[in-house]
Amino acid sequence: MDEKSISKAVIRRLPRYYRYLGELLEEGVERISSNELSSKMHVTASQIRQDLNNFGGFGQQGYGYNVRYLYTEIGKILGLDTVHPMIILGAGNLGQALANYVDFEKRGFKLVGIFDVNPVLEGIAVRGIEVQMLSDLPLFLKENEVEIAVLTLPKNKAKEMAKILIENGIKAIWNFAHIDLDAPEDVMVENVHLSESLMTLSYNLSEYRKEHETME
């Protein structure tokens, strides 16, 4: 099936499949049925089969799924079988936390540069990489291969830097700034708003309290 016809919902479930299959491998599980995977992921078995059929199925009638094979194949679909050079713009608390998250490198996301506007941070080492000034970014992009840029900047600076990134050929931006970035069709932007997830949790907590107050 043409990848363009695969829904965003399916794509967003793939990392969950990958994560759960990785956990199964660590537990020594060699094969699993769609029903067993359904119970673990809280997704219907039918949905799992439909999702995986978009990419060829991978299962065998009466056998289920070979966990290691499926884990490897989903990793390939997600592009985790290649190295993705990555930079972080913003060396504050969030930027440094992301830089220090070692699992990114295990998945092929290799940090090659960190930048910030604050001269106080210039030269400090984060995971062995010295923080550079944002003014050095255009030259760095010309001299180094970079696929992904992570933005953890204030929103007024993020828009400006996104423009520079795009002008210098960056095609993938992971944006943590408090602004949704607009970009050309050939540039992929993943906007992440951490506070929205927390507000969703707050709503669910409020509803839970209302429900239990009514029952008392």
Regions found by a protein language model. Give the residues of each.
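HTH-adjacent hinge/linker in prokaryotic transcriptional regulators
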Residues: R31, N35, K40-V83
